[in-house]
């Protein structure tokens, strides 16, 4: 397997080649096997609340989530799943639903066949699918139902609910070794073995490799990196990346981006989920936006036009450029669901909103369309650049509205029918 230092080339900047994995179809979404890296999310509603869950899945799907996981933890939740699927279909939403099962998944799937049929994938936790002599039987029951319905599974080991029998066995072997390993290293090995042994058992039960996805989630960044490097080096199953319990706000974003960014750069990962703890009253769709932004800033995919803006300094005492950057970014995200169809390729657009003369003109020239707002002590004029050339200069109190109108006009003429960028003499 390629190490990070082997991905650096003095002439060619970019990630390592993607780790070869077996492609899995989850509904109509391809995962692995060279397919684009998929962004997924999870609801935090009570799944038995049909209307509430439909509303949140719809919001996540509109935000760009390509698969959505829902908790199926009791009979009321299992009974609700087909109604949720039907309700989404009535809204024109076909985003695959993934059932998250713990402890009693085998019972729920058997007792509610309509739930088993409505879900696009089942998530199994090998650490709590069953205990002692019941583990193998209950795991086999879920695989049998998955096979019957031709559904893929994600076998997801988790640091917080690791198979204790396997962990104890490995700890005992390590204690008896002449060269014992660090306890965390043994725990990481247990994570990898738990996922791989369960996948091998699923194949023995008739589950084809192209219906198996693996994950091994921990909450510590360095452990996560090591676990997934090991998992990728020992298998070619499709891989789901995620940092469990990443945390709230900037801490969660930084932790997930640090861990997943390194793994993605090394070619590891076929689908990602950013597990953010929402702020009180916060928007659940934030995790989707962060996942998209991570993949887009690393150059793996494009989802929405990028808005580049300077961080501000003593030259930019005015907040005008900050307000304009936020206004443009919010406007673009709000319009993207409609623009995806109306303006094919618009996600490739780059917009620059800069705050002064130092870097403003240069950065604006590198964007498809950019504006350099006046800094402190500068003339109250804002040059606009289109595809590297000065297009016109905006002045007065309506600079923000005028630039927004130019962006809309550029998008319409560049990506709409006719696809011709307006070029006029600079004013």
From Swiss-Prot:
Q: What is one Gene Ontology biological process annotated in the Swiss-Prot or TrEMBL record?
A: isopentenyl diphosphate biosynthetic process, methylerythritol 4-phosphate pathway
Q: Which parts of the sequence bind [4Fe-4S] cluster?
A: 310, 313, 356, 363
Which EC number(s) are documented for this chain? 1.17.7.3
UniProt region (Disordered), positions on chain: 1-21
Give the cofactor note text.
Binds 1 [4Fe-4S] cluster.
Pathway it works in = Isoprenoid biosynthesis; isopentenyl diphosphate biosynthesis via DXP pathway; isopentenyl diphosphate from 1-deoxy-D-xylulose 5-phosphate: step 5/6
> Per its UniProt entry, which superkingdom is the organism in?
Bacteria
Q: What's a single GO MF annotation on this record?
A: 4-hydroxy-3-methylbut-2-enyl-diphosphate synthase activity (flavodoxin)
Reaction equations catalysed: (2E)-4-hydroxy-3-methylbut-2-enyl diphosphate + oxidized [flavodoxin] + H2O + 2 H(+) = 2-C-methyl-D-erythritol 2,4-cyclic diphosphate + reduced [flavodoxin]
Cofactor(s) essential for the protein: [4Fe-4S] cluster
Q: Which UniProt keywords apply?
A: 4Fe-4S, Iron, Iron-sulfur, Isoprene biosynthesis, Metal-binding, Oxidoreductase
Name of one Pfam family that matches:
GcpE
Q: Function of this protein?
A: Converts 2C-methyl-D-erythritol 2,4-cyclodiphosphate (ME-2,4cPP) into 1-hydroxy-2-methyl-2-(E)-butenyl 4-diphosphate.
The record's comment on protein family reads:
Belongs to the IspG family.
UniProt protein name: 4-hydroxy-3-methylbut-2-en-1-yl diphosphate synthase (flavodoxin)
Where is the organism placed in the taxonomic lineage, from the top?
Bacteria, Pseudomonadati, Pseudomonadota, Alphaproteobacteria, Hyphomicrobiales
Encoding gene per record: ispG
């Amino acid at each position: 397997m390629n190490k990070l230092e082997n991905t650096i080339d003095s002439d060619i900047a970019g990630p390592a080649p993607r780790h070869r994995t077996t492609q899995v179809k989850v509904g109509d979404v391809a995962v692995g096997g060279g397919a684009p890296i998929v962004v997924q999310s999870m609801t935090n509603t009570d799944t038995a609340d049909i209307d509430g869950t439909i509303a949140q899945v719809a919001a996540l799907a509109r935000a760009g989530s390509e698969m959505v996981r829902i908790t199926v933890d009791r009979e009321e939740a299992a009974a609700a799943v087909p109604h949720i699927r039907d309700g989404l279909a009535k809204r024109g939403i076909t985003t695959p639903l993934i059932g998250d099962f713990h402890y009693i998944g085998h019972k729920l799937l058997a007792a509610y066949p309509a739930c088993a049929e409505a879900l696009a994938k089942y998530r199994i936790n090998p650490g709590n699918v069953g205990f002692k002599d019941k583990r193998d039987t209950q795991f086999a029951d879920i695989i049998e139902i998955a096979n019957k319905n031709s559904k893929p599974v994600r076998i997801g080991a988790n640091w917080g609910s690791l198979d204790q029998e396997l962990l104890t066995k490995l700890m005992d072997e390590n204690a008896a070794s002449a060269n014992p390993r660090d306890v965390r290293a043994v725990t990481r090995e247990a994570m990898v073995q738990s996922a791989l042994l369960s996948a091998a058992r699923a194949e023995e039960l008739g589950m084809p490799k192209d219906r198996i996805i693996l994950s091994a989630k921990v909450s510590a960044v360095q452990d996560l990196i090591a676990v997934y490097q090991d998992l990728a080096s020992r298998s070619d199953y499709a891989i789901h990346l995620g940092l469990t319990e990443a945390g709230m706000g900037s801490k969660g974003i930084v932790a997930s981006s640090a861990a997943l960014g390194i793994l993605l750069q090394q070619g590891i990962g076929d689908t990602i989920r950013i597990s953010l703890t929402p702020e009180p009253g916060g928007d659940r769709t934030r995790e989707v936006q962060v996942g998209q932004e991570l993949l887009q800033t690393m150059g793996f995919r494009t989802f929405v036009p990028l808005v580049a803006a300077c961080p501000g300094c003593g030259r930019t005492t005015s907040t005008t450029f900050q307000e304009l950057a936020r206004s443009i970014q919010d406007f673009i995200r709000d319009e993207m669901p409609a623009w995806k169809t109306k303006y094919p390729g618009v996600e490739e657009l780059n917009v620059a909103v800069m705050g002064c003369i130092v870097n403003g003109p240069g950065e604006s020239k590198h964007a498809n369309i950019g504006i350099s707002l006046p800094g402190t002590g500068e003339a109250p004029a804002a040059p606009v650049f289109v595809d590297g050339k000065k297009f016109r200069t905006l002045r007065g109190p309506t600079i923000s509205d005028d630039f927004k109108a130019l962006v809309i006009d550029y998008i319409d003429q560049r990506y709409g029918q006719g696809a011709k960028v307006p070029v006029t003499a600079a004013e």
